[in-house]
Structure formats: C-alpha cells, structure tokens
Swiss-Prot record:
Belongs to the TRAFAC class translation factor GTPase superfamily. Classic translation factor GTPase family. EF-G/EF-2 subfamily. GO terms for molecular function: GTP binding; GTPase activity; guanosine tetraphosphate binding; translation elongation factor activity. Its main location: cytoplasm. It comes from the Bacteria. This is Elongation factor G 1. It comes from Shewanella oneidensis (strain ATCC 700550 / JCM 31522 / CIP 106686 / LMG 19005 / NCIMB 14063 / MR-1). Disulfide bonds: none annotated. Catalyzes the GTP-dependent ribosomal translocation step during translation elongation. During this step, the ribosome changes from the pre-translocational (PRE) to the post-translocational (POST) state as the newly formed A-site-bound peptidyl-tRNA and P-site-bound deacylated tRNA move to the P and E sites, respectively. Catalyzes the coordinated movement of the two tRNA molecules, the mRNA and conformational changes in the ribosome. GO terms for biological process: ribosome disassembly. Gene3D superfamilies: 3.30.230.10, 3.30.70.240, Elongation Factor G (Translational Gtpase), domain 3, P-loop containing nucleotide triphosphate hydrolases, Translation factors. PROSITE patterns: G_TR_1 (PS00301), G_TR_2 (PS51722). The gene is fusA.
Length: 698
C-alpha cells in the first residue's frame, strides 16, 4: 500500500498552554475547520472532543493527551492537502509529565497564551520543556475578545519572561469587545471572518487607516527578521529595501525550524476568529518530520545510530502513552520515526528485550477511530494487542535493534495510603493500580512493609485525586484515602571510612564477608555512585556486585528514619575474604553493614521536598497571602505586577506546609487568588522538624 500523504506534507504538532488559555477550545476549532467535527464542542458545555475522559469533562481541564489526525488545505484552499497529527496536552502543573511526554514525540508546537493574563507560571514550565526538546513553535495569543486583552503586551512578556525572539506575523484589529479581526503582516491585508457561518469564510480588506502606520512598522520588523536568515537575503534587503512574500515565508520557516525565532499570531477561538490562520501558519512555518534532525538511538553494540524519517529505513517507533480503552483494552500510542509497520506483524521491544505481536493499528480522532493496514515514518497512531510495553519503550525491527532516547521522569513528591472499602474491592484495586501505573510513569504504587498498606505516590494532590477518581469510575473500586505523606529523603554531609564485617561460624560451612568503604557526599542531583578501588584482589571480583547491591538495599531503607538516601558516593577500597566461607550473600550483608555504620557517622541529615510556588492575588490581599506563606516556612523570592491590580508572588515553600493550601487561600482571598506549585529541590529539614519526624518513626 503506497503512502497516501507524502511525508513532506505531514505536521506532527502539539497544542500546549496554561490551564485557562483556551487550548481545548482552540483544538476544537481546529477540528471544526478541518471538517472533522461538525458541531463545535464547547468546554463549558463539557462537550469538547479531545477531553474524552469523564473527569476532564467535569473539571473542564485536559488531563490525557488524545492524539487526533486531521487534514488541512489552507484557509483559501491555497495548499495541497496536508495531514496534521495533533497531540492535545494538559496545562495543569500536576500533569507536566504528560506535556513532556507529548513534546518528546512532536516536531512542532502551537503555544496558546491568554490575551489578558499573558505569560503565566505554567506557561514558563511548558516553554522550558519545549526548549529542552528543541521543539520549534509558534504562538497563538487567544481570548483577544476578553476584557484586558493586549496582544503587544503578551508579545513583550514572551520576549522578557521567556527570553524568546518573538516576531508577530499578525496585528489585532481592536481588542476586548471591539475585536473584529487581524491584519496579516506578511500580505499587509486585513482579514475579517464571517460570523454568520462560524468563521468558515472570510474576506481580505484594506488595513484600517488608524492602524496603517503601526502595521507598516511591524511589517518592517518582520522583514528584517526574515532577512537575517542568510547573507544573500540580507544583501538583497539592504539593496532593494524589501523581500518578496515567498522569500519572507521561506526565511521565517527556516528560522522557526532552527529555533531562532517564534512567530506570533492572535485571535479568539471562542469567537471563531484567527484559528484558521493558525492552521495556515502550522503548514507554512512548522517542520515536517523530514525537516527536523533524525532521531538518535543506541544499537546492540552500544553505538550511537540515527533513524531518518524514511519508509525504507528499518522500523523504529517510540511508545509515548498507554491508555486503557473500555472497548478494546490497552491502546499504545506510538510515534513512528522510520520504516513501516503492518498490523498483525511482530515487533521487538528493545527496552524490555521482548518480542510482541501487534494486533490492530488504529488512527484516533479524539474518541473514535479508523483501522489502518499499516503506519509509516512520521505517523502517530495507536496499537492494540501489546502487553508488555510501558511508556518510553522503543519498538523496532528484530534485525535492526535500537533503543531511542529514554525519557527522564521526575520522582513523585507526595504519597497517600489507600485501602479498599470491601473484600471485593481488594482484588480489583490491585489490577486497577497496576494498569494506572503502566499508563503514567510519574505515578508509583508500593506496599509499606511494616503496615502492609498500599501507598500511591504522584506529582501533587490533584494528580492523586484524579487517580483515586479513575479507580472508582473506570474500575469500580471504592477506597478510603489516608492523609497525604511527604516523601522525605536522607543524605550525608560528611566523609568517613567505615568497616563492614559479617562472620558467622555455627558448625558446617560458615559465612565470611569483610569490606572497608569510604562514604562521601555526591553533588546535588547526582544520585548514588559506586567506585570499585580494590587492588590485588583483596575482595574477589565476583563478590563486588554483591557489595554494591547490599549498599543499595541499605540506602533504600535509610539510616535515620527509614527514608531513601540520596546523592552519596561510596568507594570500596579494602577488605578480606575466606577461601571457603566467603560467598555473595556474606559480602552483600557486609556492604549493607558498612554503609549503615558509615552513614550514621557521616553527619546524616533529613531532607524535605521544597516546592516552587506562585500565587496570583489581588493587591489588597497581598499582605495576608505573604504573611501566610511566611508562617508556612516559605521564602519569598520576589513579586511581579500582573494586569489590573494583580500581584504575582514567587516563593519556595516546603511541601509539608502546603497541604490544604488551596482551601486556606480561597477563604483568605474570597476565592480571588489562585496558585500553582511544582517540585523544585530537596533541602535540609530544620532540626526541630527532623527530630519530630525521626522520633515518630522510631
């Protein structure tokens, strides 16, 4: 079966934004104009097509990124048909992992900002993640019809707060209730969309007289930005004072794909203005899979290899999301980087080192699907029938094995105990948690050995609320939820040498293991490092991994209060063995004993997770909010002025002090303030707090 759309006409994009910037409405309009969705789904009716989990429809926020395939021929039918695969990403701070996971498989992104509130804390997080994966992006400043909307102010914030070179390719005509359309700064014409047919048709008009000077100044800025793409263009621009429309577009596209500039558009998705032009910009300025560098991976011989976006290359794909569907079971969303995959064929999971067979392949449209015979380089689809695959695994061809770059997932910072309400719920709860953990790598499940309670950990209170909610709805499991627990950690601040000796003689064969370890603090975030410095075979080579294992097991259980130990460098430098009595078990125990003894002498400290908190509040409540943050041991780092008498407070606060903050903040400010928080780092817990925690756990 030949390819239906050439790969040059593919666009794999994500739509990313802050919680209330209007991203889902924007996606809905995209589906409407591309002819897929006949009735526009409004978020405030709970009818949006991409928000297909029930909780999302209730909360009006997007949690899981559904992948949707659509086609676009241009606002004026000026292009040959392009295939646009859209990954809808969540905007809530507890779900940044979903965003990161989607950005990983995209070639470009549309970042939506609210015209009134501009660059918000979460927008900065998403922007940083897009920078990390070098995703070319364009900006859509939405909600231009809202009170306080100001396109140029948002562009300025993108330049100052996000440090991006932002080049507007449009200018709004009017704002707030007078917002009527936009000026295309490349064509230098005004665009007015027809309200009678929900913006399906439009007309080009002359630029309103009062905006001519402004538009010309911005057009000049845009042409200069285009001219900087190459020396030839710059020479032509300096000689002739202008460039052709085609030259401008080609140059802006090249600079966008190189991540040198970010183009900005504006509109109001809700009022059906501007989204059509964003789709044109996606086609004209964002990359096709062949325009971005080939993905890198590691082959069987630990050598770096590349996989180009080519149907004739060996098959390689990345599983970036697992979802449970009530009708077909597990859906594995994959991005195909190279080669071809046919339904019913076998694939090799190079991370798990297992072979699997793909049952069916489906292309998703928000919540319905079409069956496909095959997928090719550049495609995003869902595979049915894969049992062992988890997020981040690579699927490849058995003869050309490769592991594509693994995704790094953050450690969860909050834990709660859950217990089933009845015996019937108990068995179902295990299955439900197992499935949810397979879908979401930032969610962990474990059993507390002492109390045999089931503990679930995640990125924030909302994250765990939704997990508990999904257990109830999707799996019919009723459970009681305990009080949230903070994920404390331990580390050492001093260096020390310690001996671990395990000897047992009780008739017959004994046990003998003896090691000397040097413990020292490692750099923050560097984790555990084991160095083998044994010379002359005083500890035989085959027992060294056992020493390492013993140390790691002791690290999991801590030395002060039973919390895992972070950032320690351990050097095994001496020891001894017995020809008959030494074995792996004995050295494992010796390693564990040596570490425990050394860590207790190496100035051990308790670490607590600290969160980066941003509170947006009306000015008259600022004193109360700051006072409350100080009482919570918060460190105020700075304040910014928002729009219309709003203050934005930046603080670092220990997580243990933030439980129930949402309710307290609401009552202190009559519901007018909002906050966002994300994990920042671990810091030493104050002595009085550390003492109380250690005593409560001993």
């Amino acid at each position: 079966m030949a390819r239906t759309t050439p790969i040059e006409r593919y666009r794999n994009i994500g739509i990313c934004a802050h919680v209330d910037a209007g991203k889902t409405t924007t996606t809905e309009r995209v589906l409407f104009y591309t002819g897929l969705s006949h009735k526009i789904g409004e978020v405030h009716d709970g009818a949006a097509t991409t928000d297909w989990m029930v909780q999302e429809q209730e909360r009006g926020i997007t949690i899981t990124s559904a992948a949707v395939t659509t086609f676009w021929r241009g606002m004026d039918a000026q292009f040959t048909e392009h295939r646009i695969n859209i990954i809808d990403t969540p905007g809530h701070v507890d779900f940044t992992i979903e965003v990161e996971r989607s950005l990983r498989v995209l070639d470009g992104a549309v970042v939506v900002f609210c015209g009134a509130s501009g660059v918000e804390p979460q927008s900065e997080t998403v922007w940083r993640q897009a920078d990390k994966y070098r995703v070319p992006r364009i900006v859509f400043v939405n909600k231009m019809d809202r009170a306080g909307a100001d396109f140029e102010r948002v562009v300025k914030q993108i330049r100052t707060r996000l440090g991006a070179t932002c080049v507007p390719i449009q200018l709004n005509i009017g704002a707030e209730e007078n917002f009527t359309g936009v000026i295309d700064l490349i064509k230098m014409k005004a665009i007015n969309w027809n309200e009678a047919d929900q913006g399906m048709t439009f007309s080009y008009e002359a630029i309103p007289a009062h905006l001519t000077a402004k538009a010309e100044e911005m057009h000049e800025f845009l042409v200069e930005a285009a001219a900087e793409a190459s020396d030839e263009l710059m020479d032509k621009y300096l000689e002739e004072g202008t460039l052709s429309e085609e030259e401008i577009k080609k140059a802006l596209r090249q600079r966008t794909i190189n991540n040198e500039i970010v183009l900005a558009t504006c509109g109001s998705a809700f009022k059906n203005k501007g989204v059509q032009a964003v789709l044109d910009a996606v086609v004209e300025f964002l990359p096709a899979p062949v325009d971005v560098p080939p993905i890198k991976g590691i082959d069987d011989n630990e050598q770096e290899v590349e996989r180009p976006s080519d149907d004739n290359a060996p098959f390689a794909a990345l599983a970036f999301k697992i979802a449970t569907d009530p009708f077909v079971g597990t859906l594995t969303f994959i991005r195909v980087y190279s080669g071809v995959l046919e339904s019913g064929s076998g694939v090799y999971n190079s991370v798990k080192q297992k072979r699997e067979r793909i049952g069916r392949i489906v292309q998703m449209h928000a919540n319905d699907r079409t069956e496909l015979k095959e997928v090719r380089a550049g495609d995003i689809a869902a595979a049915i029938g894969l049992k062992e695959v988890t997020t981040g695994d690579t699927l490849c061809d058995n003869d050309h094995k490769v592991i594509l770059e693994r995704m790094e997932f953050p450690e969860p910072v909050i834990t709660i105990a859950v217990e089933p309400k009845s015996k019937a719920d108990q068995d179902k709860m295990g299955i439900a948690l197992q499935k949810l953990a397979a879908e979401d790598p930032s969610f962990r499940v474990e059993t507390d050995e002492e109390s045999s309670q089931t503990l679930i950990s995640g990125m924030g209170e909302l994250h765990l609320d939704i997990i508990v909610d999904r257990m109830r709805r999707e799996f019919g499991v009723e459970c009681n939820v305990g009080k949230p627990q903070v994920a404390y950690r331990e580390t050492i601040r001093g260096s020390v040498e310690a001996e671990g000796k395990f000897v047992r003689q009780s008739g017959g064969r004994g046990q003998f293991g003896h090691v000397w370890l040097k413990l020292e603090p490692n750099e923050e975030g560097a984790g555990y490092e084991f160095i083998n410095a044994i010379v002359g075979g005083v500890v035989p080579r085959e027992f060294i991994p056992a020493v390492d294992k013993g140390i790691q097991e002791q690290m999991k259980n801590g030395v002060l209060a039973g919390f895992p130990v972070l950032d320690v460098k351990v050097t095994l430098f001496d020891g001894s063995y017995h020809d008959v009595d030494s074995n792996e078990m004995a050295f494992k125990i010796a390693g564990s004993m040596g570490f425990k003894k050394g860590a207790l002498e190496a100035k051990p400290v308790l670490l607590e997770p600290c969160m980066k908190v941003e509170v947006t509040t009306p000015e008259n409540y600022m004193g109360d909010v700051v006072g409350d943050l100080n009482r919570r041991r918060g460190l105020i780092e700075g304040m910014d002025d928002g729009f219309g008498g709003i203050k934005i407070i930046h603080a670092v606060v220990p997580l243990s002090e933030m439980f129930g903050y949402a309710t307290d903040l609401r009552s202190a400010t009559q519901g007018r303030a909002s906050y966002s928080m994300e994990f920042l780092k671990y810091t030493d817990a104050p002595q009085n707090i550390a003492k109380a925690i250690i005593e409560s756990r001993s």
